[in-house]
């Protein structure tokens, strides 16, 4: 009731207030009329009458004055009361509270009466109880009954126990039988293993004998060749001798010829001699010539013979050299296979003992469970332990339940069901299924061609199946499980290998279609090693898919979805590894499978693969382990590991095990990788032991066995490394070469590999969890092979040759070697691979060892690093090129590569001085995967997601944890996803399994089982580096999370000018920002230096952004290196908002804050790259922007810069105008623009175009008629005004953008300020749309538009108070002559330029033309008061009330402020203001404003009498 009465009272008060205001206006009008009438009376009446009436009129006037004074005081008192009433809080809550208290009091009375009644009943019960006590007879009877019941219960228990005992005995007998069966199977397997060892030994002996034969053949051939060469050499010598003899003869003949010539001359002299002598001479001469020609022919023939002999000799040399190299290659290949076999035997020396121990342990500890048969042989120890534990628990529970059988039979069912369900969730893969369909498992792409393992080498299968990429259950839990199964599979496959015979052929051409080698042209034309025919193209062979076999696609899709959900495998992983398709395609296929008959050949492929995938449990488990590892290491993206999509599609089979193998060479590497994996899993197990004591209970013996294996392996590897050390010392390989070599070797794997063995040197000290590519897949053309295999032993020269050969190969192959080539080499030529692998492994060890010495962890970086290193750039160039570190080892290689050249470029290199600082890209949120137990606990319960998210939000708020950290550390999600999930949680029933996982994680986090590292711990700082990282993270994070903290200066903000930050101060404030998580405003204000006395004082400032020199130059780069991942899109968005809100230019911001040109800033803000794609240099601007956004005084500092630039510009303009030198160099301005401009300082700026007032008027009139003029109009205007067309175009463009900007600022302020639109009458609002109202003020308070309106003064945006324009009075509608500019034009020249031709601030808004009668006094005053902080209030257009309006302007804002407070205060006091309230407030504001104006108005006119 009271609330209604209050509302009514307020309405009445509003009404009375409006009435008062209206009356006030009326009294004003009547008063004016009275004054007019009194004047007329004074003029018209005779003087004597005036004298008689004067005292009466004066008394009337006095009375009227008194009355008006009284009414004003009364109105003032009313206003005071009214204001207080408006501020009175709502009494409704207090009344509600009173009512509640009253209800409570009534309830208390009721409770008291109830208590009284209860006491009475209690007394009655006490009496009854006393009576009952006396009845001992009944008690005796009850005791007898109890005895009888106990007797019956005992009998029942005994009978049940007897039955149970019988059942247990039967079970025991059954289990014993099964145990015997398993023992039989293990003995058979042991025999198989012995067979395998024998076959290996025979194979070894055979290869040895073959090797010896080859050696003898090689020796024979070499001796034969040597003999041939000797013979050829002797022939050559003979030929040379003959040639020399011929030359000698030729010389003698030449001598004879010269003598003959001489004799001829003599003969010619003796002409008078007889004819006989002449005839003789002629004869002798002709015979000499014939002889000479014959000799010359002989010489030519001899020269040809010599050349022919030399050619044949070179040919022979080349042939023999090639044959020798081939023989050497064969020899080295045989040597390497021999070595591998020996190492394999060594490695498997204690294999039998371990196997025996494990089998004994199994047979002693665990009797096999029901319904398994041979499958149980494959079950690892932990699974058996768990099953035994469960069976014992269930038996125990069953006994307990049977004891309490009388009371609760229902409870037993409840316990049995989950017990029976659990073992099913962890199925052990039976390897006994493997031999049944080996061909089906390895079927090729099309799903039909059988690929028999009989034709493959044992290395192929042992490496593919024993590689650590197939942990058969989630990590840590089943270390022994995975080890045992791998070894069992290895034994089976190597047994299968025996059938292929021990010939040197690795692939037989028969049993499988050539199409299984996914080779594409150009290599298709070349037959492979064993003369196998080139395969037909993919498209031809794809037609051979069996069309007859129908499949139920819907059923297959359903089964796949079930398996994926059951094992928590994502569709992306499934699509990637099994189908070779994207996540979207997989989702489409599984959601809407087409019927079989409607599918194309290509469309049927995925279903073949899915069927193959479902056919074997191994595939599913392998994929599950990959999924688990992906969740552990989400930073390594799939794209990085597997870039060859077409290759993957060609070679993909439904059987996952053939696709996930690493291309390792030889079983020795495989064994090493098994041991490495076992070691890792043991470590994981140790850490997991406290959490899972039951699983670790019986694994003591097996742990010791595995440890002994590991120690032996380590000893062997240390011995190998010791053998390699001398080679390492002498090998002439620079560190950089090795750094290149290692990544190249590690980055060319052709197969999709998940994890393979790391280089030996790394694996000794630091087992790598990151996936690496195998080293064996490097393409090996003969030239490289020859070099790599020249040294079969471990001589240092050989290692160096190999490394240099690989280097050369890297250089050649960087541009052109394709993935198909890698694949072809890995698939078709495994023996060549094996031959090269030992040398490459050496090279890897070399790389690994040296890198360890230099502080890097050794590993793969990007090919771009290799390229840049080959070309030899400086470290700074190298850093510019460096992509965001994509490889797990890139961090170390960056360190090692740039370590040497750091001294050259201390400033340029963005490396931190300490190698502790992490520099690799911040990984995506990584969280450990949930265990199956955690899933089971919550997955099938109904969880209240709304309540859960509420609790999480409360806990986050209480502990001050931001959503980004929570998302990264607990949920593995981005901040956006977390925010979305917490604000709008879906109901549990509508969530998929993947969607439920975050909520399960939240629940576990609330229970304290997950992500405890997220909670802030006081006083734990790990060294200064980490401290600086966290301190940086806080201000950055503060900026990221709360976008409200962005400073937005309103139109009224115009602080006093201050100088830009000097270099030292800026560094100081930067470091303060970094070290204070929430920078206090006072501290950053202190960092601003006082205003310099004269402009040239800042000459000494360097021209870099936030200038950093010497030590501080590193600080910003260290910040960049240590900064967490930033949201570049969010930062640029907020920067753009702040710049537009405050009318700041990108040029100023770029030069002052970022040290970039306007173009670069514009590009950065328009198209920001994501953080992880940026180099360190590219991240710097974003870190600077973030620091700038976090600085509370950022806008003010830029404003100061802008004002100083403007002042400098104005000075320059004035001086240039006065000296008639329009092209004066802009020396003063450049002092203030802190950015290093691209042009040198002495270059001249273009002069600014300054338009005359009449030109501006004409252009404005043209604009009002047509804001977008046609080219013809532009040309006409240009000719009329004698301007360039470009100037006119620019003026229109600038004018349009200025008006748009004003409207935009106006809207922003109207939205952000409570008092916006204070006098926004509907007519004024409608006037806003009209193009003629350019004079609207920025605050949203316009002059009233009507037939007699004049445009009032227009306040400028911030920082433009110096350029305020005086509005034109109505009389000056015509443009004044150029000689006598109007009052506003004198100043108009200074800032109302035409188009901006050079860099510089945009022209300020122009005043519109004033075309009508004066505005009403109130409106003029209102608009003058609208922008209180923007400089002097402008005089209104109408001359009479101008004094009053200007004098009352300062007073009004304060009264408004006292009534409504400033917008910030209002926002803080009541943030729930809805638009309705705002309108109401604005309306009241206008009424009170008018009343106050009337009350406080000084009398403008005195009484006449």
From Swiss-Prot:
Give a short account of its post-translational modification: Phosphorylated by PKA. As cells progress into S phase, a fraction of CUX1 molecules is proteolytically processed into N-terminally truncated proteins of 110 kDa by CTSL. Cell cycle-dependent processing of CUX1 serves to generate a CDP/Cux p110 with distinct DNA binding and transcriptional properties.
Q: What Gene Ontology molecular-function terms does this entry list?
A: DNA-binding transcription factor activity, RNA polymerase II-specific; RNA polymerase II transcription regulatory region sequence-specific DNA binding; sequence-specific DNA binding; sequence-specific double-stranded DNA binding
Q: Where is this site: Cleavage?
A: 643-644, 747-755
- Which SUPFAM superfamilies has this protein been placed in? Homeodomain-like, lambda repressor-like DNA-binding domains
Q: Which residues form a coiled coil?
A: 56-407
A biological-process GO annotation: positive regulation of dendrite morphogenesis
Q: Where is the composition biased (Polar residues)?
A: 396-407, 440-451, 868-877, 887-911, 1036-1049, 1230-1242
Which PROSITE patterns did the record assign?
A: CUT, HOMEOBOX_1, HOMEOBOX_2
Question: Superkingdom, according to UniProt?
Answer: Eukaryota
Q: Name one Pfam family in it.
A: CUT
Composition bias, kind Low complexity: at what positions?
516-546, 694-703, 1050-1066, 1316-1333, 1405-1436, 1443-1455
Which coarse location class describes where this protein primarily resides? nucleus
| Family designation | Belongs to the CUT homeobox family.
Q: What is the annotated quaternary arrangement, including any partners? A: Interacts with BANP. Interacts with SATB1 (via DNA-binding domains); the interaction inhibits the attachment of both proteins to DNA.
**Protein name per its UniProtKB record:** Homeobox protein cut-like 1
